[in-house]
């Protein structure tokens, strides 16, 4: 039985290939800058990032659009003194946009692109990005390119938690839908590549990251690991401390780490891969912490250490990263680094499954089908298998057929 569930944990390691398919605890507020120092009428602020939340609020309510955007950033990403709050972030971005600040308009576009704090609306996002582009915001070109790629279902989403695009064997280009089967699709991809190239030339980190992504995966361009490596490297060399740049910096470090693991365009170098993962993990990336956990669990580039793996999975799980939650359940099920605990396995698999993580849904189906950690319940097992099957997870359909047959036998 354990062998069966273990096979469900998608983890391919030819030459160390990793598969994985999300904010930190709020600390005590930092010392605030007295508002009287920055709220003087007509005072020109040179560094908004040095201001406290309350200091920014004073300026923001006076109509300072840069302060409004900075508040939006703090609320969108969360920091030492600010809890993440998408609704309030959206409000500040809207206020900045309404005052004519195109950076606020661009920020709004990303919320509608990703469905963060609002229902996803690609048409609205496209409108906002075009307005921001007309206003000279280079990052809006990245947003518009992502609208195109999202409409085409190219899975180019910085926030995606499902890393299935990394599931091919070493050196093998993943199969995809016929993404250039029509002239319209080809023109759309061409436009997306042009937009990303323009943004990258303007030193926009998002543009450089996504350009690296499309070259690595051959989306709208010929697959070119060398160019992908170059663009990712440019991003990782950035010293930007801006909140909105950290995702691209982290994602680029992760991408480089995986290229070193798989030997894509470089010699396999597990030590360098670990360094990139550690850099991103220390910068708050849950996905990077998960990959480090995978290295320790499998013993790739490091001595196998299940307790260390659990440590990193828990670090990622603190940010609700579904693959890490799933893997914690896997360790509890098998008793790797911990005592066998089916109840804990079920608990963590549920946390991952609630996020739509198909692997965890299949694992939960197996646990309910066999009564591990829960009372055996074929109907519940069937429900989880069907969820995974609806998302196209390989093997889930066969499980649905099997459990339906068991249910029919009981009738």
Range-by-range predicted roles:
Residues 70-77, 107-114, 146-155, 212-217, ...:
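Hydrophobic face of amphipathic alpha-helices that form TPR/SEL1-like repeat modules
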Residues 61-64, 78-79, 99-101, 114-116, ...:
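Short helix-capping/linker turns of helical repeat alpha-solenoids
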Residues 19-20:
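C-terminal motif of bacterial Sec signal peptides marking the signal peptidase cleavage site
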Residues 232-236, 376-393:
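TPR/TPR-like (Sel1-like) alpha-helical repeat modules
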Residues 387-411:
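Terminal, low-structured helical/coil segments at or just beyond the last alpha-helical repeat
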